[in-house]
């Protein structure tokens, strides 16, 4: 029994000893493995530093053979391990070395070739100079003549280089211009496509006629007149007629033979009020007889018509703001502006109704601002109010008028519009848009100028599109004659062979003399463009000029930047009298009533 116990004890001790030995061996192997990786890592770093000094693959292999880690008598690793490590480094690093060597060789070759080319060019230039000097000597030229010849030749070289540079710059500028033009065309096409109100030509009349029925017995007839009606309205020594014309600021033409009274005025607002006032006078005469027709009735009818007109204008303005979604807009600081907006309905510009034009411009501006990620509402207000200055007249009607100190004439509607916007404390961007839509400089430094530019574009698109304004045939003929007179000068100088005017004078095709040089062509385009833009009438339109030589080229005049006010069918602005009275927003009262 004791013997068995001893044997078991020896067995356990042996097992423990064996386990201890195994653990020791395992730890030793791990230690060597760790040391191997550390040595490998250290070697790799050393090798990378040395690679920078090595120029070819053979030197790399020799260097690796000399390293202690790759010696065959190393006791820690086998030759197979060393071979694998060596091949690994060679494969990774040799390609890099070869590529660097190749790039270096190519760089050296390029540098050498450049040097050779420069030397050859220098020698060639020197030889040319020598040949020219020799030639000049053989020609027996004086020093000054030779110097002049050389300078002329030098100028020719410079001119050729300059022409080449100009062509390159023109090509780059045209490419950039075409890219911008394409983007702008897309933007404007989208803007016009979103406009719901595209009006046609509207003829604003400067004369209104009241026609009467001459009846003595039938009191039911409307606008009936008695025998003495026309005499009474003219008055003794034409006093009543003169008083009406002075108060209404219109011209009255009485035609008893045709039972008509015509009212004439270039101020369409005054024309509308005078028409309504005269109808009130006639109604009073119909109801009470001609004995009531005196200055008191005339004043009462005039001021009553003024108040009715103000109320109607305010209603139209409020409806306009509601239709555009601006009635509660934060950019409309007061509803009093509604009356001035409504007055635009009774104004015309080149046969285009100003209110309709303003609404259309507002819709275009909104679409443009939407595509540019700007404030659509502000852009819409800017365009709607850009012609608001056309809603007022020259002077105030009474001391109660808000605009009694406004001395701007109606034809300077920009200044008047700025005055209105500043009085009602509109946003500075809106004020500057009103001020700048005809090319003026902005008033406020902090205002955002792109709203003014959008307003100007919207105004132009609405006013200039085909069909919106009436054009007389003699205007087209006059435009053709003006263009022909300008082009004839260049035909006489044999720069232009022939020309053709197309599209009512908006397109001009020119056949250029094939013998002219590039510099002469450039000068022709500049001179012709300047001649067209300096003409008062032609500067109002963008005219495209196509030049035909060996290749086709196209130039467009920038007429819009120099455009003056267009010719109107009637001139409501120029017909303003010095004593013209303003229709202010106050209530009009007759002191005698």
From Swiss-Prot:
Record-annotated KH domain positions: 218-278
Any one Gene Ontology cellular component term annotated for this protein: plasma membrane
Keyword Nuclease applies: yes
First-level EC class: hydrolase
Keywords, alphabetical: Cell membrane, Endonuclease, Hydrolase, Membrane, Nuclease, RNA-binding, Transmembrane, Transmembrane helix
UniProt cross-references to CDD domains, sorted A to Z: HDc
The HD domain, residue ranges: 354-464
Catalytic activity, EC: 3.1.-.-
UniProt-listed Pfam families: HD
Membrane-crossing residue ranges in chain numbering: 6-26
Family of the protein in this entry: Belongs to the RNase Y family.
Role played: Endoribonuclease that initiates mRNA decay.
NCBIfam families on file: HDIG
Annotated protein name in UniProt: Ribonuclease Y
Organism: Mycoplasmoides gallisepticum (strain R(low / passage 15 / clone 2))
């Amino acid at each position: 029994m004791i013997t068995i116990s001893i044997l078991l004890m020896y067995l356990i001790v042996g097992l423990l000893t064996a386990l201890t030995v195994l653990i020791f061996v395992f730890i030793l192997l791990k230690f060597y493995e760790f040391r191997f990786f550390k040595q490998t890592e250290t070697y790799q770093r050393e090798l990378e530093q040395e690679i920078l000094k090595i120029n070819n693959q053979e030197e790399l292999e020799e260097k690796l053979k000399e390293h202690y880690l790759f010696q065959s008598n190393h006791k820690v690793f086998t030759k197979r391990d060393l071979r694998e490590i060596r091949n690994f480094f060679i494969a990774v690093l040799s390609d890099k070395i070869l590529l660097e060597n190749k790039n270096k060789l190519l760089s050296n070759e390029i540098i050498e070739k450049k040097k050779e080319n420069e030397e050859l060019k220098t020698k060639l230039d020197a030889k040319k100079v020598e040949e020219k000097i020799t030639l000049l000597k053989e020609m027996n030229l004086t020093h000054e003549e030779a110097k002049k010849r050389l300078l002329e030749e030098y100028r020719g070289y410079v001119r050729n280089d300059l022409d080449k540079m100009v062509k390159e710059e023109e090509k780059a500028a045209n490419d950039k211009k075409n890219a911008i033009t394409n983007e702008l065309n897309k933007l404007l096409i989208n803007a016009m496509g979103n406009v719901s109100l595209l009006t046609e030509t509207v003829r604003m009349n400067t004369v209104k006629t009241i026609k009467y029925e001459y009846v003595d017995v039938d009191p039911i007839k409307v606008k009936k007149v008695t025998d003495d009606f026309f005499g009474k309205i003219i008055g003794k020594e034409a006093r009543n007629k003169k008083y009406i014309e002075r108060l209404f600021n219109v011209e009255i033409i009485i035609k008893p033979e045709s039972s008509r009274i015509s009212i004439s005025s270039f101020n369409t607002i005054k024309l509308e009020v005078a028409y309504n006032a005269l109808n009130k006078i006639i109604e009073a005469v119909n109801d009470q007889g001609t004995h009531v027709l005196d200055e008191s009735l005339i004043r009462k009818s005039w001021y009553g018509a003024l108040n009715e007109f103000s109320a109607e204008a305010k209603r139209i303005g409020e409806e306009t703001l509601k239709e555009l979604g601006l009635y509660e807009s934060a950019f409309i600081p007061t509803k009093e502006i509604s009356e001035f907006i409504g007055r635009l309905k009774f104004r015309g510009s080149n046969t285009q109704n100003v209110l309709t034009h303003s609404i259309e411009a507002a819709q275009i501006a909104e679409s443009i601002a939407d595509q540019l990620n700007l404030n659509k509402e502000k852009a819409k207000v800017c365009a709607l109010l850009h012609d608001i200055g056309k809603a007022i007249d020259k002077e105030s009607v009474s001391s109660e008028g808000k605009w009694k100190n406004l001395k701007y004439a109606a034809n300077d509607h920009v200044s008047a519009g700025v005055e209105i916007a500043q009085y009602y404390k509109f946003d500075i961007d809106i004020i500057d848009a009103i001020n700048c839509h005809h090319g003026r400089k902005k008033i406020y430094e902090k205002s955002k100028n792109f709203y003014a530019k959008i307003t100007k574009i919207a105004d132009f698109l609405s006013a200039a599109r085909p069909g919106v304004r009436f054009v007389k045939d003699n205007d087209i003929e006059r435009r053709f004659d003006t263009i022909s007179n300008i082009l004839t000068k260049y035909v006489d100088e044999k720069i232009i062979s022939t020309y053709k005017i197309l599209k009512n004078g908006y397109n001009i095709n020119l056949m250029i003399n094939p013998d002219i040089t590039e510099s002469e062509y450039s000068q022709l385009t500049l001179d012709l463009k300047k001649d067209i833009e300096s003409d008062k009438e032609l500067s109002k339109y963008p005219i495209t000029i196509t030049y035909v030589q060996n290749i086709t080229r196209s130039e467009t005049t920038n007429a819009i930047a120099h455009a003056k006010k267009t010719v109107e069918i009637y001139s409501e602005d120029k017909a303003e009298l010095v004593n013209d009275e303003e229709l202010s927003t106050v209530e009009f009262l007759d002191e005698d009533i």
